[in-house]
Amino acid sequence: MKKNKKCLILCIYSLFLLLYGSHLFALESDAEQPIVIDSDTATYDDATQLSTYTGNVISVQGSIRVNSDKLVVHFKDGEAEKLVFTGKMAKFKQTPSEGAEDITGEAFTGEFYPKRNLLVLINNATVWQGSGAYSSDYIEYDIKTSLVKAGEKASDSKRVHVIIKPKAKQ
């Protein structure tokens, strides 16, 4: 009963922040913002320190938004250490700075490490910004510096595919 009450309070708080939170957060402080999760179902296992969310999962941290079918949050000492997103295609979007074009991406699996500001996209991954794109089976995106690394040297995964379009003449 106690866990259900905690879950209900968390869901109500999450919904409030999801609806009104985008007006409260500054882009440069995404990492300092809480991670807000909204889903159809939620369970927490205190013994394994895992929280599982399923069904139209939406997670938001500042200007970062991830949509997925399932999210598993791994906790360590009461803090979210790793978030694993899975689904038909897990999708993310971030506004890196005021006035900059959004960075978007998708993959079948995503891993987010909040303390390291690192998002890893695995299996059929693509990241876009403006008209440019990176595609690979493995992409790392440093959220703080907007640095994208694609491909794995130690595997036989597909090659990296990059599209760089010229700016339109004015």
Regions found by a protein language model. Name each.
Residues 1-170:
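Mature-chain termini and adjacent capping regions
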